[in-house]
């Protein structure tokens, strides 16, 4: 289907967290049933502005998933709510940890229930065969769980050659203002507010911001802009996200704050500083020197290819599924032996 080969390894039931992450599972060796229509989403179904529906995937509601008789190879979940919703479904389960508990508190989303959520998750993991996979070491430490750490990945061959013809910076972020603490929005604004910048994403409160029309449009935007911006509090969020890795795969240098997990080396693949005035000077330098931007961007692409290739993600997630299946079988055998 569309050039993607699937084995007869069984289907995965995947709760949709966000399309860019789920799309990585295309080509993993399992066809996908994707649960859409979950609360807290910008759209009620799969958002094709983010990614096309993975080849061979079927979209279904939570009720349809709960009533399905399909024997899934594994269930892929992303929150305590997902775990509760899928409690009645038997099968190997993997929960993917995408955020920090501290970030939930900083965003004022769930300051009161963060400790309860962490305890609930730990109880689930101790009493069931659910296996936890964190997208980074920071996220694993925050929740105190994580059987495996599996960063997301990108396919550099999927992106356009970088032209950088627009003397503008670009950033991709949804609900940017609501995540001011996590994303160091004050630093971003102090450094870049007077410079030509494009903010891509669902941000109805920010004039001029909007989502890309589709993935092809996002690739075009990345290809034509001069540099990418990623700022994040080191205590709350990683020094990269999927969008910044996409930018690196597109050959853009990245500007941001100093961060222990940033893949950027200052002066080689981008520029890092906690001083907004210095970040502004770096940005102005790149806006005025497309050759420098191209040189740093080429190194950024080399780094992301070596460290974050989607092949490594898919191999790692196949292993996570196998480990979840093994744990589920052992749990079932112990239950039978106790009868």
Protein language model features and the residues they cover:
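Extended catalytic core of nucleotide-activated donor transferases of GT-like folds
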Residues: 18-21, 33-128
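Conserved catalytic-core segment of nucleotide-activated headgroup transferases in glycan assembly
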Residues: 34, 142-145, 153-218
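Short alpha-helical segment that forms part of, or immediately flanks, the ligand-binding pocket
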Residues: 219, 241-249, 262-263, 268
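Short hydrophobic beta-strand element within catalytic cores of glycosyltransferases
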Residues: 249-256
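Conserved acidic donor-binding segment of nucleotide-sugar-dependent glycosyltransferases
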Residues: 266-277, 285-291
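A charged, aromatic-enriched C-terminal amphipathic alpha-helix characteristic of glycosyltransferases
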Residues: 288-329
